[in-house]
């Protein structure tokens, strides 16, 4: 990371990943070209992250031959005029992680992954989860991304006095 003063620890980065409305997952396709998609991921152990989709498609084909992925999450993204110098800038919280994607084949783990996604994005509707699973499990692909190293975090944020919060300083 070029600006070490903005680096944050892996626990902080995991918090960003849990709060981000989506996480961009980047793959390398069969031709060696980058392929990034914003996906709705969820995890209950901070190591295994799940997403779901159709049983066919480009990302599933890519995973079979190139399972290595990079995840990028951003929260609190706010265009800002620098309080001290009037510069145009952006306040943000971000996380980067690397992992290995695998298509889940066991129904029990598919249900576990889908439950994590449901609890994260639709907790108020979990009473309908079992019915939804009964209807759609056989036509839903679930992918597990296992992080291969702790995520890294980066932040640019100003405090109430307009001073940039550096070197992990918290509010």
Task: Name each region found by the language model.
Residues 13-14, 33-49, 81-94, 125:
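Short N-terminal helix-initiation segments at or just after the protein's N-terminus
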Residues 46-47, 67, 148:
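Beta-strand-connecting loop/turn residues
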Residues 20-55, 71:
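Short beta-strand segments
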Residues 2-4, 78-171:
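Charged, gly/pro-rich active-site loop segments
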Residues 56-60, 70, 78-79:
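Histidine-centered metal-chelating micro-motifs
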Residues 28-30, 54-56, 74-76, 100, ...:
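Histidine- and/or cysteine-centered catalytic micro-motif in compact active-site loops
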Residues 63-65:
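Short nucleic-acid-contacting surface segments enriched for D/E, G, S/T with interspersed K/R
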Residues 1-24:
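Short, basic/aromatic recognition patches
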């Amino acid at each position: 990371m070029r600006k070490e003063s903005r680096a944050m620890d892996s626990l902080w980065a995991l918090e960003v990943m849990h709060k981000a409305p989506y996480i961009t997952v980047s793959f390398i396709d069969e031709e060696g070209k980058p392929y990034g998609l914003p996906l709705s991921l969820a995890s209950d152990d901070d190591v295994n992250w799940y997403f779901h989709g159709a049983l066919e498609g480009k990302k599933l084909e890519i995973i079979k031959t190139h399972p290595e992925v990079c995840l990028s999450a951003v929260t609190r993204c706010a265009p800002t005029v620098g309080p001290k110098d009037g510069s145009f800038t952006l306040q943000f919280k971000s996380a980067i992680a690397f992992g290995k994607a695998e298509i889940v084949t066991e129904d029990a783990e598919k249900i576990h992954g889908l439950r994590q996604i449901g609890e994260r994005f639709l907790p108020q509707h979990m009473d309908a989860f079992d019915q939804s699973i009964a209807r759609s499990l056989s036509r839903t692909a679930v992918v597990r991304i296992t992080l291969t190293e702790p995520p890294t975090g980066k932040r640019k944020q100003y405090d109430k006095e307009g001073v940039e919060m550096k070197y992990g300083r918290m509010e």
